[in-house]
Amino acid sequence: HFKNIQIVFNPEFLTEANSIEDFKNQNRIIIGGPRPATTKVRRIFAKAFPKVPIIKTGSTTAEMVKYFTNCFLATKVSFANEMYEISKALNIDYDKVTEYAVYDERIGKSHLNVPGPDGDFGYGGHCFPKDVMALKSLAWELGCSPRMLEATDSKNNDIRTNRDWETQIGRAVINIKD
């Protein structure tokens, strides 16, 4: 019935709080799928975002880029929260520690605020928790041992009070006009 349908995977890298601005100011666009379909989609994006790199790849690679990004940032949040706890135990200013640490450009400034933008510790929302759990599950199915993802998830479960993702199961589409 559907042999002429070609599906393209285009992961978004948006934050819930700034989704429209994030969309307008993308730093890259990933398009995964069969070549004829990705070529058509690339043309559409190239007109709207002429200065943004557009990367065409396979669907699985595009999906893994999304998981990699979200799981890396979730791990960074868990790590930052742990450094916050240690700084607090040493009676030193965590904000000064991060201010001086990010002089090393390899670290990057994002995702180091503790508590986070919602005033809670750890990460919430529906993307990071969902993606960490999904990639952990996939890794186990593939015979891999996702110890880092296990630690990230465990740390978050220990420190996060607002477990908002538990009430957002199945939420994938929002109406941005409201």
Locate the predicted segments by residue.
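Internal alpha-helical scaffold of NAD(P)-dependent oxidoreductase catalytic cores
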Residues: 2-11, 15-110, 138-145
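NAD(P)-dependent Rossmann-like dehydrogenase/reductase catalytic/cofactor-binding core
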Residues: 88-178
